[in-house]
A protein has these predicted regions:
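Short, amphipathic alpha-helical "lid/cap" segments that border enzyme active or binding sites
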Residues: 78, 174-182
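Small-molecule kinase domains that catalyze NTP-dependent phosphoryl transfer to phosphate-bearing small molecules
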Residues: 33, 38-54, 130-175
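Conserved beta-strand scaffold positions in the cores of enzyme catalytic domains, especially
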Residues: 12, 107-109, 164-166
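ATP-dependent small-molecule kinase phosphotransfer cores
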Residues: 21-89
Length: 186
């Protein structure tokens, strides 16, 4: 996630807030935006193969409505992230916010990770006793995140050079990670 360093209290911008903002910007129901995000891997691969990603094969910069839906969503979310960052202190989780706001000096870019077994245990605790499905769900989620991030940033997801702080929540625990992040923001 990414945090704008400011002395006042931060506003959290989870995925759902960005979905609603993107939906309003491009005129689609938020449920469609969320559903499209869930199926993003296949469409990004398809768009990439067809050479239709934003900025790749367009002779001039297209209007937002002329872009594929996945691109419209990204552009609208990018705009929402930039506008929220201008308004005040905030925390973004995902959506390439670290990359979108990379030129700002008041940004703390954090990547929290854990080993697969620890993540699996946490997922089972969170989502219930669906162990046989959780492992595949985690794999697909990581794959979608990696493809999304790498497509829009041309950088490797999880590469330490993209972050100011990387924390292993499996070794440190969630509470210690929160404490360290709060100290880093000061």
């Amino acid at each position: 996630f990414l945090m704008i360093r400011r002395p006042q209290r931060s506003t959290l911008f989870p995925y759902t807030t960005l979905f609603r903002s993107a939906a309003k910007e491009i005129g689609f129901p938020a449920e469609i935006i969320a559903d499209r995000e869930q199926r993003l891997t296949n469409s990004l691969l398809y768009n990439f193969a067809m050479g239709t990603l934003y900025g790749l094969s367009y002779p001039k910069e297209p209007k937002l409505s002329e872009l594929p839906l996945t691109e419209q969503i990204y552009v609208a979310q990018k705009k929402a992230i930039e506008e929220a960052a201008k308004r005040g202190s905030c925390v973004f989780i995902g959506r390439c916010a670290d990359y979108i706001l990379r030129s700002r000096p008041d940004v703390l870019r954090v990547f929290v990770y854990a080993d697969r077994d620890i993540r699996l245990r946490r997922a089972i605790d969170e989502y219930g006793d669906l162990e046989e499905h959780i492992d595949e769900f985690m794999h697909q989620t990581d794959k979608r995140r990696r493809i999304y991030y790498e497509n829009y940033t041309n950088q490797r997801w999880g590469d330490r050079e993209n972050y100011d702080l990387m924390l292993n929540s499996g070794d440190l625990g969630i509470e210690k990670c929160v404490e360290l992040i709060c100290q880093a923001v000061k």
